[in-house]
């Protein structure tokens, strides 16, 4: 039975690595996958899912106006799809999460989404909010704070390594711009305790 999955975490937990491994596992068994990533995230090149450990795969892009159900349904007319995998799923809209649930419910294709749960202000992203609400299965991928505790928050940093507390929710960046931390160190660095 097909399901909608959401694998979530803070940054540097291996979400893209896990997605790429899942896609490889399907393809190794002669099953086809459709891999998507957000057009907004071009850190490693447009149309690529790339892991920090150096592996990558070409991907279709989703933008705010992309109708994922229609696009996947069109692709099915050309070839069978055994699994859909979505990287940077926090950037999905509410409507796109609903479309992915239709891929599961109407097309009977499993959809595996990977993304951040919250932003640098500890607020849910739109895509994450609706995946947390509507996914059939949720799984947290864990990483650690510099103190060794589980990291479940992310700090945004400026060029001098100082914490930024305000700004646009979406700012594409990697290890130079963000730091995954535990709740205690998030509160400390944000001046909340």
Swiss-Prot record:
InterPro entries listed in its UniProt record: P-loop_NTPase, Thymidine_kinase, Thymidine_kinase_CS
GO process terms (BP): DNA biosynthetic process; thymidine metabolic process
Name assigned to this protein: Thymidine kinase
Subunit text: Homotetramer.
Entry's localization field: Cytoplasm
Coiled-coil intervals, chain numbering: none
Catalytic residue list: 88 (proton acceptor)
Residues where ATP binds: 9-16, 87-90
Originating organism: Haemophilus influenzae (strain 86-028NP)
Listed GO MF terms: ATP binding; thymidine kinase activity; zinc ion binding
